Amino acid sequence: MTGKEENKQQQHVNFPWKRLVAGAVAGTADVWACHPLDRIKTQLQNNPGKSIVGTFGDIVSKGKGFTGGVNALYEGILPMTAEAIFKVGIRYFAFSWFTEQYKTTVYKGETLNKKQQFGANLLGGAFAGTIESFVVVIPCELLKVRHMTQEHNKSFGTVFRDVLREEGFQGLYKGGSATLLRQITNHMIRFPTFYAISDYLKGGDHSVHLPVWQNLSAGAIAGTASTLFNNPLDTIKTRMQKQGQNQTTMQVVRGIYQETGVKGYWAGVIPRILRVAPGQAITWAVVELVMGILEPSSKKH
């Protein structure tokens, strides 16, 4: 096999530390671009009877001075940025590390065909979702939900101390089962979907770096697909993590159905898509952009 052919058949993921850096940069970009949509989505899931416009009005009318008005949409963005740096960095590192280990162990380092690569990406996504959930996502999601749905303007630090004082360390993992399942299904869908689209656009040549708009499009499609599939898990997770909700997962599931029927599981799905689709578009585009800088020898369309 010639050097050109070897380069063309190179697999998706190499150098996990580079993916760690790329993920951290991408996570920061995602939060700063999409945090307002996340606020609206979280409020809608806890108040399903509200409209998007009504929820927007409630948020911007909350608080005084710097925390009031449109600034309220960015409340809590600094701790969310810190979370994103670790979360997305760990996600891409875990995915890269697992898929490399999987290919080495199962396929002895041989080049994978499309079906084998899809399976590796599927399992890698599940592994990445599991690792990021336990290390970062579950406790940070709980603090985010408590902070966004509180009646008083407490800081993130105060909310964190309140949880530890009233519920102990285990309180940070309340609603963890729903969050874990959401993250696993998220990335079992996003990684294979993005790379399947990317492979098609690259014509099978993994040395090619796609233009930004194509990575944006592939990321948005991957994000939308995962959201449509697992929005019920996100709704259940948000309800369980809201302060004062001391219910099991099944109790929350039954409660949502009794209140609003099946449609209740899809509360906030539109703002969640409006949040996740651009967020994933930005994340994937930035990851690929940073990888293009870290691996400048690759070709471009």
Curated annotation (Swiss-Prot):
Identify the stretches annotated as Solcar repeats: 14-101, 116-200, 210-293
* Location(s), subcellular: Mitochondrion inner membrane
> Could you list which ranges are Mitochondrial intermembrane topological domains?
1-19, 87-117, 192-212, 297-301
Pfam family, any one: Mito_carr
- List the Gene3D superfamilies: Mitochondrial carrier domain
- The coiled-coil segments of this chain are none
Residue ranges spanning the membrane: these are 20-37, 66-86, 118-138, 175-191, 213-229, 276-296
Q: How does it sit in the membrane?
A: Multi-pass membrane protein
Keyword annotations: Membrane, Mitochondrion, Mitochondrion inner membrane, Repeat, Transmembrane, Transmembrane helix, Transport
Main location group: mitochondrion
Q: Which family does it belong to?
A: Belongs to the mitochondrial carrier (TC 2.A.29) family.
Role of this protein: Mitochondrial solute carriers shuttle metabolites, nucleotides, and cofactors through the mitochondrial inner membrane.
The protein's name: Mitochondrial substrate carrier family protein Z
